[in-house]
Amino acid sequence: MIKEYYGAETFILNKDFAYILVIGTTDVSLIPGLTIAGATPELTHFTPAADAEYVLLGKCKSINTIPVSPTGIPTPALLTRASLSFINPLKIVVNAGSRILPKIPYIDLQGEPGKDIRKQALSMEKVNNIIENSIKLGEELSNEYELIMIGESIPAGTTTAMATLLALGYDAMDKVSSASPDNPKELKRKVVEEALRNLPTDSLQRLAKVSDPVLLGVAGTSLGFKGKILLAGGTQMTAAAAIINEFDKNKLKDITIGTTKWIVEDKFADMLSLAKQVGVKVLASMLDLSISAYEGIRAYEKGYVKEGVGAGGSAIMALVRGVSNNTLVRKIDELYGELVGSNNLHI
């Protein structure tokens, strides 16, 4: 089942599409207690590369296991790979600025890893590189596809998303989600408030100060693409949509955010109000993982992880094409079981 918000419609998704995964890092993820998108703050810089490797290969090369939370909850890349296995679209990894580079083929936007937003996230040179090169990528994809789905992997991305939304004038304080069931709102607020001090007046310079490479890469690819776009992600994609809207007021009519029920039902965030403010449509997968054989998968139903790597959008694409909830969960369990059996995961 898929829920539709703000005029979103699923029929536009019934065509061939390419899956684009934009990866990057931000030094904000090194702040202790801010994100659980990695077993330790230091390992969060390996998460995007490992996510990309797993989606393409079914195994990781940059680290010897798939990314997990400190309590062992697996990356949403598992859900993405399971969903896409029923469709087998073209998959493209785009490096917007990852500290660790994936050991697979990828497109490089000539960006840089995001630094601490309390000081300066990105140089203007790299911001321009990311936007210009991703626009070109979107234009090229338009030659082959009428629909693309864009996912993201960047630990601490909800914090940079909140800073970005606020910098662009939206009411976003405390409204973004977290990979943890215990959203560290006070810490996020403190980091973001410090980042927003002495903001420049120019929009692009504001983004260079407080944003991250992934948001810019997602926005640029969308700006360059001529067809329909499913932004596969949670509250981060509302920030990407806000950037898109900053540069092209007509673009959002072709864009829908595709996410999970765990995001839209998150009591500690308000993704739908953010989407409404920005003016972007939303679809949410009602995928139910409570029937999984594995505790690590069932943990998603308790508010862990929630979204990432295009998990919600990928599930929507599978469900739209007739894959049942039970079939999809069986596939997720099968892939998870392979990882457990090969000692590539400890539960």
UniProtKB/Swiss-Prot annotation:
InterPro entries of this UniProt entry?
Nict_dMeBzImd_PRibTrfase, Nict_dMeBzImd_PRibTrfase_arc, Nict_dMeBzImd_PRibTrfase_sf
- Entry GO MF terms: nicotinate-nucleotide-dimethylbenzimidazole phosphoribosyltransferase activity
Task: Give TM regions.
Answer: none
Query: Which CDD domains has this protein been placed in?
Result: DMB-PRT_CobT
Q: What family name appears in the similarity comment?
A: Belongs to the UPF0284 family.
- NCBIfam families referenced in this protein's UniProt entry, alphabetically: nicotinate mononucleotide-dependent phosphoribosyltransferase CobT, PRK04447.1-1, PRK04447.1-3, PRK04447.1-5
What PANTHER family does the entry give? Answer: PTHR38811, UPF0284 PROTEIN SLL1500
Q: What is this protein called?
A: UPF0284 protein LS215_0030
Which organism's genome codes for this protein?
A: Saccharolobus islandicus (strain L.S.2.15 / Lassen #1)
* Biological classification of the source: Archaea, Thermoproteota, Thermoprotei, Sulfolobales, Sulfolobaceae
